[in-house]
Each structure stands twice: as structure tokens, then as C-alpha cells.
Swiss-Prot record:
GO biological process: chromosome organization
Organism annotation: Epstein-Barr virus (strain B95-8)
Keyword set, alphabetical order: DNA-binding, Host nucleus, Hydrolase, Viral genome packaging, Viral release from host cell
Gene3D superfamilies named among the record's database cross-references: 3.30.420.320, P-loop containing nucleotide triphosphate hydrolases
Descriptive protein name: Tripartite terminase subunit 3
Keyword Iron set for record: no
A matching Pfam family: DNA_pack_C
Length: 690
């Protein structure tokens, strides 16, 4: 690695190089290396800014950071100013004034230990000069010069020189710029793509981004789902105009969902080119909706603006970039012609659209969330962690965390949300906020398949048949999720009772379900809940006399004392012998008849989802319920909660699951999930209370 003592010599070379009035960039004008490593040729690496050094420095982030801070300013900047509108890092304005903090004694000692570079090694010196020449050649490459002009023009565009009004890129707009810019680099400079990727990193503030991640911009297709009125078309017009005016031999296509949109973009591009650049170089053909920008001594660049109504208008064309505006609303008959450009080696399709959940036909882009490549980019004002809070609170209009912000030109408040949703329920979440989670309510991304739910509903087991009953286990598993409230709008007590196939424990049958609410808030809540459980078990045992024992888990997360009381009452009153899951007291050796729900809930949900999708979970034809049966089929009541299951990603990469809805809690679902978990895992120990 580099020694600290070498920094003085490097800084001196940089100072001399930066002060030279040379057409070369930065320290590439230096002919003398600062360091000369004379080891084996296979172990050394010629660095154009430093010298010949050990090859291990190729993986040294410190060297990269050193050259970034003390090296020449990026060559694409006309002056020594940074590009804050791109997110670029601040410039080190006065590198020549940086003073090294080495004590004279230490400096003299290090100089004796580390002599000056040995310039007699002609082979190493030749390697260094070759690297300098190669670096200079890249900076003189015509494609590089065009790319530099594009970045400079984009900076001027955003600073207000073209539109007389400064602008700043939103994050998704910067993404569209990067996908367009870096893809053109990859097809126009195949041999030096990685080098140019590295050179332009600092222009966009991507210094910390690895080369592997930069290769994402080389994707053949990218999808952006953006809320309404966020500047989607504006940035596309800017990108197309600047590419035409600065890059030669680039063919661009633009497809809109409506003719008037394509006409407006066509006119705006012409206006930008004629007012900001040499209008004599602009040729317009309104019959074919094409704009050509002439480059002196080079091949011209063109753009074609088309609509999806003429699905054959883009057939036979060659595009390097194809922008599909409001892609969710493109006529499906035109999609084959658009997707055909995926086969073109040097073509990239960029889909940009607002979100619409009205029907599946206009939400097809959201399917790409399951793509192997990370194609989908979604802008939303509600993060996954707070999605449930947003559904439950009508006055909430954005995410309560501070990772997201609302642009100043967007108005969002509770009145707008209420009024918008009066026109069309859910319109505020999807059309205005870019929220795509509601798409899962359709058939776009189901956690549980529709055919599996239909089978659970229709194919119920006749457990009263002696032949079927003979195959069932003699144990009944009951899970109790108690809630100590009489508010029917809040959570209630969920109770589920299941058994399993004697030969296959993974084959589970639902025998009973309860969703119980207290009549009043008195001191006998534990008694009321326990009585409901005993009544359920008694009914099931009457119908299924082959059952011999009951294994119960009473959740104690809400109130441990009440959970123990519920278990004690059940143990005394149950018509069959009862055994309970016990939890050991941390401060003593005592064990309490209650179950503390921890991180097993996510695993239990995944197990149930798999069981429903594989039809290993069934319901009895005589599913018992003393609380649901009066108003609703208990199995359909359960299915309504299963349909609402949705995964919520956590920061550690795992998922949690919920089935809560605005007007319905998921108490019965949670009880069934845990009862199924107890019956299938067979790893919990059940003990009697008395």
C-alpha cells in the first residue's frame, strides 16, 4: 500500500501539474512518477496519476479516495466548480494550499528509508508512460468528448441558461438520466466502458457506488412508476433534446398513449433545440414525426415521436433509446412492437408511467417487481413499514417517517384525500401518491393463489364420516389469542381448533373458529373467554367423539395473569383432558400455562400460506362456531382474512405478515396460523395444569 510519506511528493507533483497551462487534464501532464515499484512485473500496476505501484493497490479504496480529493478536477466541468444539481461532491477548491502535517524529524527519517523513485528501471518507466498515454487517449476520445458535452449541457440546462429558470433533479429524474447516459456509454464505447463509467461517477455523486452496481444502468429495460404531476415528461423532453444536440449517431424513439401527448412532446423538443442550439442544424419532418439534428462531419441524431394507436409506426425502425410514456395505458396491441426492441443488441426501453389500480390491464408494469433483474423503480409517499397505519387512519396523507418528502409543488392534506376518495375509493393512494400496495388486492400479486382459496372454500371434508374420522388424530389443537375489550371495531379474541391426519401431520383440518368480543368490561374477562373456548371444544367433541385430548396454547403477550387464569378455567371445565403450552419464568424455575408469541409468527404465517397453496389445509363441513355462525359462514369469514394476507419487508431482509383490513381485524387468522403451527411442527411440549 502507499506510505504516508509519499503524500508530500504526490502533492508536489499535483501542484506543478495543476499550475501548468496545458491542454492535458490535471496531473496527466506530469512526466515523472511519484512512486516506482520495481518488483516483479506481474505484481506491479502502472497508475497514471501516481506511478508504478504494487498491484494490490488496485483494490485499495484509500488510493481511490486520495486521487479523488487531491487529483485533477473532473474533466467534464468547464470550471473548477462542482455540480450540486447532480448530487456531486463538493470540489476541493485549493489543493495547492493543502499543508502536510509531518514533523521534520519524521520526514527526514522516512526520506532516508524511502529513497526517491528509481527512474533507471526503463521497463517500469515505460509502463507508467503508457498508462499516462492511455489515460490521455481516453480524454481525447470523440465519444468521451461528446459525453462530456452532454453533462455540461445538462448542467447548463438545470442552472437556467436554457429555460431562464433553475431546476433541480428529483431522485427518480436523476435515475432516468443515469439509465439513459450510462447505457449510451456502454454501446458507444465498448472497450473503455468501465473506465468511462469510473470517470463520470463524480459528476453525479456516485463515488461510493461500486462498478458492479453501475452496471445496473446497462439493463435492456427499466421501469419507473411515478405519481401524477411529478415531471415525468419534462425530464424525458430534456434528455432527448440534450442527447440530440450533443451526441452523434443516436436514434431515439418516443411512444405516447395519446396523440396530443406525442404532439406536445414533439413541439417541445423542437422548441428546445431551436432556441438553445443552432436552429440551422435542426430538421423537422412532420409527416413522419421525426426531428434530425445535424452534426458537422458526423452522423446525425434523430428522434421519432409516435403513438400507440399506430402500432406499426415504429416497426422497421432502429432505436438506441425508446421512451414509452404512460406505459401502463399503452394499447396492448402495440406492446409486441415495443417489446421487439428488447432483441436489438444496442437498444434500451425505458417505461415511465403513473400508477393506476383501477384494473389489471392498466397496472401490468407492477408485475415486474418479481423480475430477476431489478427493473422496477417505484416512487411512493408511504413506506412498507407504515403502510398498515396509512390504511387505518383516514387523516394520514404521507409516511410518518422522515425518509420521504413531498415536493413543494404537490398539495396533500386530509381534505384532499377525503374528497378524492369520494370520487373513487383508493384514488388518492394510487393516482396521487404512487402507492402500489393496493394492486395486491387485485390478482396482480397474491400471497395466496385464487385457485387455492377456491379449493379451501368448496372442497370441505366430511369429518362426520366414520372412515374419515378413523384417519384423524385423537388430539385437538386449540390456540387462544385473547383480547380484553368489548369494542367490536377493535381486535377481539381469536380462537381456532384444528386436528391433523394421523398418518400425515402436515395435513390439517379446521374444526372450529371463534371471534369473541366481551359483553362488558368487568372483572370476569378471563372467565368469559375461557367459557367461549370450553363451549367450542364441547361442540367439537360432540360431533367428533374420536377425540381423546385437547392441546391448548393461550397467548400471554397482552396479559400474562389473565392468560394463566384462562388456562386454569379451561383445565377445570373442559370435557376432555387438557394439556397446555407452558412458559418458564426467567427469575425462577416455575412454568406458567401460557404461550409468549415471539419471532415464530412469521414462520407460522409462511407455513400456513404454503399449506393453503398446496391444499394441505382443509375445513370440515361442520366447522363449529358459536360467535360467527349466526351472521356468516365461519370458513368464508376466515377466507376473507386469508385474502388480505400481505407481506411487509423488514430492514433485516425478512418479512412479517398481516391480514388486517380497515373494517376487519385478523384475530381469527392469527389464531388459525398458530394452531396450524402447533399441530404441524410437533415440537412444543404440553403439560397439564392440575
Amino acid at each position: 500500500m502507499l506510505y504516508a510519506s509519499q503524500r508530500g511528493r504526490l502533492t508536489e507533483n499535483l501542484r506543478n501539474a495543476l499550475q501548468q497551462d496545458s491542454t492535458t487534464q490535471g496531473c496527466l501532464g506530469a512526466e515523472t512518477p511519484s512512486i516506482m515499484y520495481t518488483g516483479a512485473k506481474s505484481d506491479r500496476w502502472a497508475h497514471p496519476l501516481v506511478g508504478t505501484i504494487h498491484a494490490s493497490n488496485l483494490y485499495c479504496p484509500m488510493l481511490r479516495a486520495y486521487c479523488r480529493h487531491y487529483g485533477p478536477r473532473p474533466v467534464f466541468v468547464a470550471s473548477d466548480e462542482s455540480l450540486p444539481m447532480f448530487g456531486a461532491s463538493p470540489a476541493l477548491h485549493t489543493p495547492v494550499q493543502v499543508q502536510m502535517c509531518l514533523l521534520p524529524e519524521l520526514r527526514d527519517t522516512l526520506q532516508r528509508l524511502l529513497p526517491p523513485p528509481n527512474l533507471e528501471d526503463s521497463e517500469a518507466l515505460t509502463e507508467f508512460k503508457t498508462s499516462v498515454s492511455s489515460a490521455r487517449a481516453i480524454l481525447e476520445d470523440p465519444n468521451f468528448l461528446e459525453m462530456r458535452e452532454f453533462v455540461t449541457s445538462l448542467a447548463s440546462f438545470l442552472s437556467g441558461q436554457y429555460k431562464h429558470k433553475p431546476a433541480r433533479l428529483e431522485a427518480f429524474q436523476k435515475q432516468v438520466v443515469l439509465h439513459s447516459f450510462y447505457f449510451l456509454i456502454s454501446i458507444k464505447s465498448l472497450e473503455i466502458t468501465d473506465t468511462m463509467f469510473d470517470i463520470f461517477q463524480s459528476a453525479f455523486g456516485l463515488e461510493e457506488m461500486t462498478l458492479e452496481k453501475l452496471h445496473i444502468f446497462k439493463q435492456k429495460a427499466s421501469v419507473f412508476l411515478i405519481p401524477r404531476r411529478h415531471g415525468k415528461t419534462w425530464i424525458v423532453v430534456a434528455i432527448i433534446s440534450l442527447i440530440l444536440s450533443n451526441l452523434s449517431n443516436v436514434q431515439i424513439g418516443y411512444v405516447a398513449h395519446q396523440k396530443h401527448v406525442a404532439s406536445a412532446v414533439f413541439t417541445e423538443i423542437i422548441d428546445t433545440l431551436t432556441k438553445s442550439f443552432d436552429s440551422k442544424r435542426v430538421e423537422v419532418n412532420k409527416e413522419t414525426s421525426t426531428i434530425t439534428f445535424r452534426h458537422s462531419g458526423k452522423i446525425s441524431s434523430t428522434v421519432m415521436c409516435a403513438t400507440c394507436f399506430n402500432k406499426n409506426s415504429i416497426r422497421g425502425q432502429t432505436f438506441h433509446l425508446l421512451f414509452v410514456d404512460e406505459a401502463n395505458f399503452i394499447k396492448k396491441e402495440a406492446l409486441p412492437a415495443i417489446l421487439g426492441f428488447m432483441l436489438q443488441k444496442d437498444a434500451k426501453i425505458i417505461f415511465i408511467s403513473s400508477v393506476n389500480s383501477a384494473d389489471q390491464a392498466t397496472s401490468f408494469l407492477y408485475k415486474l417487481k418479481d423480475a430477476q433483474e431489478r427493473l422496477l423503480n417505484v416512487v411512493s409517499y408511504v413506506c412498507q413499514e407504515h403502510r398498515q397505519d396509512f390504511d387505518m387512519q383516514d387523516s394520514m396523507v404521507s409516511c410518518p417517517c422522515f425518509r420521504l418528502h413531498i415536493p413543494s409543488y404537490i398539495t396533500m392534506d386530509s381534505n384532499i384525500r377525503a374528497t378524492t376518495n369520494l370520487f373513487l375509493d383508493g384514488a388518492f393512494s394510487t393516482e396521487l401518491m404512487g402507492d402500489t400496495s393496493s394492486l395486491s388486492q387485485g390478482s396482480l400479486s397474491r400471497t395466496v393463489r385464487d385457485d387455492a382459496i377456491n379449493q379451501l372454500e368448496l372442497c370441505r371434508v366430511d369429518t362426520l364420516n366414520p372412515r374419515v374420522a378413523g384417519r384423524l388424530a385423537s388430539s385437538l389443537y386449540v390456540y387462544v389469542d385473547p383480547a380484553y375489550t368489548n369494542n367490536t371495531s377493535a381486535s377481539g379474541t381469536g380462537i381456532a381448533a384444528v386436528t391433523h391426519d394421523r398418518a400425515d401431520p402436515n395435513r390439517v383440518i379446521v374444526l372450529g373458529l371463534e371471534h369473541f368480543f366481551l359483553k362488558d368490561l368487568t372483572g370476569d374477562a378471563a372467565l368469559q373467554i375461557a367459557t367461549c373456548v370450553v363451549a367450542l371444544v364441547s361442540s367439537i367433541v360432540t360431533l367428533h367423539p374420536h377425540l381423546e385430548e385437547v392441546k391448548v396454547a393461550v397467548e400471554g403477550n397482552s396479559s400474562q395473569d389473565s392468560a394463566v387464569a384462562i388456562a386454569s378455567i379451561i383445565g377445570e371445565s373442559c370435557p376432555l383432558p387438557c394439556a397446555f403450552v407452558h412458559t418458564k419464568d426467567k427469575t425462577s424455575s416455575l412454568q406458567w400455562p401460557m404461550y409468549l408469541l415471539t419471532n415464530e409468527k412469521s414462520k407460522a404465517f409462511e407455513r400456513l400460506i404454503y399449506a393453503v397453496n398446496t391444499a394441505s389445509l382443509s375445513a370440515s363441513q361442520v366447522t363449529v362456531s358459536n360467535t360467527i355462525q349466526l351472521s356468516f359462514d365461519p370458513v368464508l369469514y376466515l377466507i376473507s382474512q386469508i385474502r388480505a394476507i400481505k407481506p411487509i419487508p423488514l430492514r433485516d431482509g425478512t418479512y412479517t405478515y398481516t391480514g388486517k383490513q380497515r373494517n376487519l381485524s385478523d384475530d381469527v387468522l392469527v389464531a388459525l396460523v398458530m394452531a396450524h403451527f402447533l399441530a404441524t411442527t410437533q415440537k412444543h411440549t404440553f403439560k397439564k395444569v392440575h
